[in-house]
Each structure stands twice: as structure tokens, then as C-alpha cells.
Amino acid sequence: MLARALLLCAALALGQAANPCCSNPCQNRGECLSVGFDRYKCDCTRTGYYGENCTTPEFLTRIKLLLKPTPNTVHYILTHFKGVWNIVNNIPFLRNAIMIYVLTSRSHLIDSPPTYNAHYGYKSWEAFSNLSYYTRALPPVADDCPTPMGVKGKKELPDSNEVLEKVLLRRKFIPDPQGTNMMFAFFAQHFTHQFFKSDQKRGPAFTTGLAHGVDLSHIYGETLDRQHKLRLFKDGKMKYQIIDGEMYPPTVKETQVEMMYPPYIPEHARFAVGQEVFGLVPGLMMYATIWLREHNRVCDVLKQEHPEWDDERLFQTSRLILIGETIKIVIEDYVQHLSGYHFKLKFDPELLFNQQFQYQNRIASEFNTLYHWHPLLPDTFQIDDQVYNFQQFLYNNSILVEHGLTQFVESFTKQIAGRVAGGRNVPLAVQRVAKASIEHSRKMKYQSLNEYRKRFLMKPYTSFEELTGEKEMAAGLEALYGDIDAMELYPALLVEKPRPDAIFGETMVEMGAPFSLKGLMGNPICSPHYWKPSTFGGEVGFQIVNTASIQSLICNNVKGCPVTAFNLPDPQLAKTVTINASASHSRLEDLSPTVLLKGRSTEL
């Protein structure tokens, strides 16, 4: 009888034991497979490593490791030696070879086809085929692990409000030393919300953006019904209205398109565009208006080239041209600015035609999370000689009409954005959004910062001080989390020490770049069967794509062709900045937020 009781107790203990894979024993992208209740096996297939935990490098891997520089070394080389890079940029075969390396080395870090999602931490047909999920770069922490980060850290994560108040919320605006401006900030927000579309009913693990990439649904609408309501059905164009001699989006009343506006907004100020949340701030509506004008302009060009084409073909071809323009602007202007490289990035799909590359993409929830760059936002917005706080700015399309696009572009080009890394720079006005980012990450059971660093070929941090580059915030984080291996991803990205004179820290760049470049170059228009003049209506349409830039987009669609870029016109304005947020000790209670964003804006 006693023997049976002991056997039963042993069985119960074994059944309740922690999943042996909770400690993430398999290294170098080896996959952990539990064997019974207390053992595991690492699958090291095609990792370049072998051994019980995939830690012993194969011969070729050893050579690669000896020759491969660290990410920070590569970044240093690319952001220094300007004279050398000027020569490289003017030698086509050298520039092409380096660009091929940049694209392949980054994009090969992204699993394609996708592997996991929030509910499947192992390979499954559901994780592959169900497009309503965001994919995952790393599987979620198993439900039966002893701590939220597996086996490291405390039994419970710290209160999200405490994390916000101690290390994330702004005491004083910290400008970006790279000179990033508000034209960039609103472009980022506008561009990414064609594929970051979390399903508000089902939760943060799900998306309504089933195209999972650059489809310009934020211009044309997510569904065919919405698209049809926004279309003019004449000459391929989108509906519009003329105000003071300039083209603006049509109204909700005219289109019967659902948009998110508070009830007090008058009908004439309720503009209707592809993304239902873009009425939130005039900066988003500015870009929505610019792209509306560009679509209708391209339709006019194609109509002149092809008078025989019907409305549908003019519309569809114009959409492909705008997709091409978008990708070129993102790579050659947007990513170029973010990188800080002296090497000149190049959008040329032909560079990958002889490489192993899959023309498909799936948006990862980690990519969505890391793109919450709310520190970019200033405390106030200056248009010409008028200053608006958040409360005056939100849902106020009348500002856009009153000032006009020219003043908006000129003003946002000159207004500096905030630094994203380094901590304590999230505006109080959007603290609810930052809090939601933390809580959504926990709901989706993200692994720790260090696990993501290893996944993207970076060395794990050994201390909080190494993460932040200072002592005060590091001590606060250690008190909150207890172990650097239990540090959460999202807060870590915002408190990580920035690279020298840069907007981001190492992890943000090394994680974000692979997702970004794979998503851009994995677009169908970049594939061999699409990338040819006939796809874009002939040489004229192909030329529009191949000559696109943020400056040409503005020149073609904004009166007076104001000079613009994604950085301040005078780089000296960004030089005198605080390097570390720990220097600011002002109390949060001394500052009062203007407004808390609500509803669908948690993703903005």
C-alpha cells in the first residue's frame, strides 16, 4: 500500500514538473523537443552546430565565426570612413555586391515560410496556414514554465505602471541626435499601419491585415467593399474633393466609409481614407492626402499613355506603381536615414534574382511590438508660427486645411523628433499606448530580451548596466526584474543605450532590419515575373517607380515643391542633446498629460 502511494506521488510530481525546454537549453537556433516529462532533445539540423545543446560549431561555422565582425563593428565601419564610401557608392559592381550582402544577410534571419504563432510554439499547419495570426520569430514561453520568462527571474513580472513610471515616461523631451524630423515620424506611422492591424476583437496575437506586407491597404482599403466606396470609377481614380483649389480626401458622408471620429467632429471635417484610424492626427491625414494626389496623378499619366485602357486597369496599374514608389522611398530615403550609413542603399530587385529568396512575407508580432516608436513624438506640434498640444492636434483635420499641405511639410521638415532609445522619452500623452504594448507582450508570452538577442545573432547582455549604459535606471530595472535574463523585450528596446549619436540601440536595429528588408523585398512586384516595365504600364510607369523619392513625392503633389527630407535641414540643430535619460530627475507628478489616446489608437 505504501509503495503504491509513493508511486502515485512520484507520478504526480513528474506530471507537474516544469517543461524541460523552459530553460531554453538549445542554442544557436537549435530546437528543443521534450522527451517524456523531464528530458529534452535538441534538434541541431542545419544550424552549423552539433552536440547535446547545439553549442559545438562545425568546421565551416568556426571559420565564419572567426571572420565575421560583430554588429557594432559593422555599424561603425558603415557610419565612418565617408571618403571611402563615396568611392564605393560610385563603383556600380562594388555597390551592388555590398547591397546584395546587406539584403541577404538580413532577410535570411527571417523564417520563410513562417514557423510559430502565439498559440503554437511548435511547427504546425495551423501556424503556417492561418493568416489571421501574426507569426512569431520565437515561440511563446510555455504555459507550464515556472516563471514568465521560462526559468529566470521572478514568479511575477513587475507592474506595468511601475515600469512606465521608472524608466519609460518622459521627464523632459530628449531630441534625436540623428536629426530625425516629424516628416519621418508621421511617415513611419502612416506606412506601417497598412500591415500592423491588430484585431481588436480577437486580441494582439491576431491581425486583420491578411496581405502581411506592403499592399497600400491604408490608401485603398482593407476590403474590396471599402475600396469600391473610395473609388471614383472613372479613369482609375480615387474619390476626392477640392478645397481652396487643392485636392483632399472625400468625406465619410459622401463615401459611406467607416472611419473613427469622435461624435463632436463636424461632417465636413470627417475625411475618408483607406485606414479607419487615420483621422486621429493631421500628420497621418497629411500623408493620406499626398498619396491620394499621387494616385490620381499617376492615373493621368497612364491615361495619356494608354487611352485604350479602362478604369479598372488604370486603377490596378496605378496601385502597383505606388507600391513600387513606396518600397523605393522606404529603402533609399527612410531606411537610409535610420541606418546613418555612408554606404548608399539601393532598391533594385534584380540584385536578388540569382539568390535564394522567397517572395512571400508574414508579419511577426515582435516586429509590430518593436515598431512602437512613441518617443519620436514631441510634446507639442508647431505648424508655421502656431503651436498645438496633443489635445488640440487630435482628430483635427481642420488644421490641415487651414494651414495647407505646404506649411505642414515645411514645418514638419524643421521640427525635430524624439530619440527612441535611452529611456524616459515616452510622452505622457501616449502612456496608455505604451502600457498596452507591455501588457500585450505579456499576453503573447514573449521570451526575454536576451533570447531575442541570441535569435538575431547578438551576444546576450550580462547586466542591466550593460543594457542601459548607466547606473541609475539599471538599478531600478534590477529591482523590478531581478535578472537580466528575465528582462522584457519592449521596455528593453526603449531603455537600451543608443548607439553613438543614433536614434536606436543595437537590438532595435539588428531585430528590425531583417523584418523590414524581408517584407519589402519579398513583395510580389520585386519578383522576376513582376519586375519589368509592362507590369507598370510601360517605360513611363517603370520610370516613376525607379525615380521615386520623398522629395519627388512632395514636389509632384504639394504646391510650391517645398524642400523636404527625413532629417532636419540643419544637422547642427541636433548636436546638443542629452546622451542619457538618467540625468533627468524631475518627478512625474510635476508633469500633467494633455490627453490619453483611447480605443483603436492603442496600436498607434
Curated annotation (Swiss-Prot):
Cofactor: heme b
Signal peptide: 1-17
Pfam families reported in the protein's UniProt record: An_peroxidase, EGF
A GO BP entry: response to oxidative stress
Record's subcellular location: Microsome membrane; Endoplasmic reticulum membrane; Nucleus inner membrane; Nucleus outer membrane
Chain positions with S-nitrosocysteine modification: 526
Membrane-related topology note: Peripheral membrane protein
UniProt keyword annotation of Iron-sulfur present: no
GO cellular component: cytoplasm; endoplasmic reticulum membrane; neuron projection; nuclear inner membrane; nuclear outer membrane
Pathway assignment: Lipid metabolism; prostaglandin biosynthesis
Family: Belongs to the prostaglandin G/H synthase family.
Summary of subunit composition and partner proteins: Homodimer.
SUPFAM superfamilies xref list: EGF/Laminin (SSF57196), Heme-dependent peroxidases (SSF48113)
Protein's name in the database: Prostaglandin G/H synthase 2
Coarse class of the protein's main subcellular location: membrane
